[in-house]
C-alpha cells in the first residue's frame, strides 16, 4: 500500500493515473488517499503502508511526513515552497519537481522489492520525527491512565472488603 497525501484530490489522481500508465507492471500496488480520514484510521493506514507520498507546495508545515517517519514509513515528497529545517536527504526522498514523484516512486518500489532500501532511511526518519514528538507527555498520560485504573480497582476492592467486614461484625 502506498499512502498518499496531497492538498488537492486532482493531484492525487494525477500521480496515481500517471504511475499506472507509465509502470503497468506495478498495477498490483494499492494507493490510499489519506485526506479526510479520522485519526485512528490515519495511523493504522500509515503502519500498513510501505511508503508515503507527500505533495504540498503551499505548506511546509504539514505534519504528514513527520507522522510517516514516526511510524517508520519512508517518505517520498516534493519540497514545498517554504522548506522546513528538518527536511534533508537522510530522512526521506525529496524532489523539487512534482512530475518526478512517479519515477522516484517506481524506482523506490523496485528497490523495495529487491530489498535494497537502507535501514538508515528508516532510522533517520524516526530520529527526525522524534524531535517533534512529546514522548514524555505521552508516557505521562499512559502512566496516569494505568495509575488511575489501579486506584479505581483498589477502591472497589477495599469497598467490597469493608462490606464483608461489616457483614461479619453484624
Language-model segment annotations:
Residues 44-49:
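Short alpha-helical donor nucleotide-sugar binding micro-motif in glycosyltransferases
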Residues 43, 66-70, 84-85:
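Short alpha-helical segment that forms part of, or immediately flanks, the ligand-binding pocket
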Residues 50, 72:
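A short alpha->beta transition loop at the rim of the catalytic pocket in nucleotide-sugar-dependent
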Residues 1-42:
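Conserved catalytic-core segment of nucleotide-activated headgroup transferases in glycan assembly
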Residues 113-168:
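A charged, aromatic-enriched C-terminal amphipathic alpha-helix characteristic of glycosyltransferases
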Residues 74-78:
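Short hydrophobic beta-strand element within catalytic cores of glycosyltransferases
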Residues 57:
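Aromatic "clamp/platform" in nucleotide-sugar-dependent glycosyltransferases that forms part
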